[in-house]
Swiss-Prot record:
One of its GO terms (biological process) is photosynthesis. Belongs to the PsaL family. The lineage of its organism: Bacteria, Bacillati, Cyanobacteriota, Cyanophyceae, Synechococcales. The chain crosses the membrane at residues 108-128, 165-185. This is Photosystem I reaction center subunit XI. GO terms for cellular component: photosystem I reaction center; plasma membrane-derived thylakoid membrane. InterPro entries: PSI_PsaL, PSI_PsaL_sf, PSI_suXI. The keyword Membrane applies. It is found in: Cellular thylakoid membrane. The keyword Membrane applies. It is a multi-pass membrane protein. Keywords: Membrane, Photosynthesis, Photosystem I, Thylakoid, Transmembrane, Transmembrane helix.
Length: 199
């Protein structure tokens, strides 16, 4: 420690600032009031899980808690079925409209096969998550999800979720394929295909 630093550490007098540098509009108690309503710790403050106006707001909590992964009262298999159906249905469109065969007669079938292939890859990743020596990670309650599903975070629950995900994903892609193959969409399919064509 230098002599300059030692003089400050041994000094018992508080440091005085010139009044021209002092902001009188901020009082010492103002910062505590802002901390009380804006950000609170959920459980252990060392973990860093904080309740903010975004993650503990009504809209965010209602949206997250109504997703099939966190909704109360449904089995892990149905959670996987609903999640997989959404993934398969939503993956079909980009694979069909932006895939390498988008301008051919096989675009609709190629999109179906690509979406089912992507669902198979995601299912393999879910199987690998359940394969290591320990059970799946159990999520503790936090500011957004008060009651995470306990039956999902077991080996059997995760296996049920995975099988439901595979079935729902393939079914969602097939459902999207059937919708695109109807006669009602024949008039707008060329318009949609020409949006992403290069050249």
């Amino acid at each position: 420690m230098s002599d300059f630093q030692k003089s400050f550490s041994e000094s018992t007098n508080s440091i005085k600032f010139d009044d021209k540098y002092r902001d009188n509009s901020v009082q010492p108690d103002d910062i505590g009031v802002a901390n009380q309503w804006a950000v609170k710790t959920v459980a252990d403050p060392c973990v860093g899980n904080l309740a903010t106006p975004v993650n503990s707001g009504y809209f965010t909590k209602a949206f997250i808690n109504n997703l099939p992964f966190y909704r109360e009262g449904i089995s892990p298999n149905f959670r996987g079925l609903e999640t997989g159906a959404a993934f398969g249905y939503l993956l079909y469109g980009p694979f069909t409209m932006t895939g390498p065969l988008r301008n051919s007669d096989f675009a609709i079938t190629a999109g179906l096969l690509a979406a089912i292939g992507a669902v198979h890859i995601m299912t393999a990743l879910l199987v690998l998550y359940n394969a290591p020596g320990k059970a799946p990670n159990v999520q503790p309650p936090d500011a957004t999800v008060n009651n995470p599903p306990a039956d999902l975070f077991t080996r059997a629950g995760w296996a049920d979720f995975t099988s439901g995900f595979w079935l729902g994903g393939c079914g969602g892609a097939v459902f999207a394929w059937l919708l695109v193959g109807t006669l009602h969409l024949d008039t707008i399919m060329p318009i949609i295909k020409n949006i992403w064509t290069a050249g």
